[in-house]
Regions:
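Sec-dependent bacterial lipoprotein signal peptides
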Residues: 1-10
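Glycan-association/targeting regions that enable binding to alpha-glucans and other polysaccharides
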Residues: 10-117
Length: 117
């Protein structure tokens, strides 16, 4: 777990729940999952828009069923590629004087290795 400070003073911890190595599959789509904890009480949890970032491409994530702070999505890995580097970006709003304000946080970079043919 790595703590990443946000611009507005929130301590955020990402926990990557994705196996580092996955078997190659015919669909070329690989599941990734993360948990995010934030100490900021003013965070508007219903405003979170998480993404998986691979290079300059962003892939959407969905809330993990029955969990309050976990999200999951899929990373495409083309045939012949054995390593993908990715990170998570969470855009959200927090309550402030007046109206809610936007903010975001980014996880450390992770590596997914694909084995098999």
């Amino acid at each position: 777990v790595l703590l990443v400070p946000l611009l507005a003073g929130c301590a955020t911890a990402f926990t990557n729940l994705t196996p580092q190595i996955q078997e190659r599959n015919a669909a070329g789509q690989y599941p990734v999952e993360t948990a995010m904890d934030c100490s900021r009480q003013a965070l508007r949890w219903d405003s979170i828009q998480p993404k998986i970032i691979v290079g300059n491409q962003a892939y959407p994530m969905s809330p993990t069923p029955l969990m309050t702070n976990r999200w999951e999505g899929f990373v495409p890995v083309p045939p012949g590629t054995t390593t993908v580097r990715y990170h998570y970006k969470f855009d959200f709003e927090y309550n402030a004087f007046g109206k809610p304000k936007p903010d975001s946080t980014v996880s450390p970079e992770y590596t997914l290795r694909i084995k098999g043919q």
